[in-house]
């Protein structure tokens, strides 16, 4: 019997927990959100853009950025990450699609894990020689090959100088003088005439100079993107200051002569003839009691124009 008494309150508590949660009409069918405009964007928001900005840019789902990845059972609005508005968890996924969305024209970020410490980059070439032991144990000295004897070149400068001193002028006399006094240039003289190469510093490294290292940390941190954004903001700020500092000229007062100079006498135009059949006829049916009611209805129609646009006449919003 005591067990039957204790089971009564538990059954009542279980029935209370199983009762459905009642929701209001605004929770079940939330009103449509007003599209984003340029006036809603503040500095530091995720949807802040540089350059020429129009209201139509914030109504395009391909350009507008989402607030961020939505957690399980929670949905967020797409206005800005700094002012996230939470929606009822039971309605998650019915009003706004959460999740990251790639910006138009910008590739998705990808990353790969690097290999371990023992990994060697590049190709491994097996040496064909003895390697380090052979290099330490012996030293290959380049043996100079014997030079083959070659004919020495004539020293025409010295032969011409001697012919002039001897008083020989004609070509025949010069030819005979060269046959008798054949002066040749020795290898020692040729080596002395050549300019010796400049002395090299002892710590000089031979080979191709390596290019500067790639700034990987700046690339990974998007440093160049941040510098570009800062330059664009500084340029726009300077343009705004220049517009504010422009001198506004005073009001120009017109005189009687300037008004007479601009005055154009009106030309009376004859009205065109219209057929009686095409003359404007007043409306036969008036569904509005007064003109104020008509203007009020037209104003309401203009306000609902943004909601009735789109493919399905359900409005263009910032969320798909």
Curated annotation (Swiss-Prot):
Annotated region described as Disordered, given as residue ranges: 1-27
One Pfam family here: CFAP77
Bias type Polar residues, positions: 17-27
GO cellular component: axonemal B tubule inner sheath; axonemal microtubule; sperm flagellum
Domain of life: Eukaryota
Record bears the keyword Cell cycle: no
Keywords annotated in UniProt: Cell projection, Cilium, Cytoplasm, Cytoskeleton, Flagellum
Subunit annotation: Microtubule inner protein component of sperm flagellar doublet microtubules.
Main function: Microtubule inner protein (MIP) part of the dynein-decorated doublet microtubules (DMTs) in cilia axoneme, which is required for motile cilia beating.
Family: Belongs to the CFAP77 family.
Protein name in the entry: Cilia- and flagella-associated protein 77
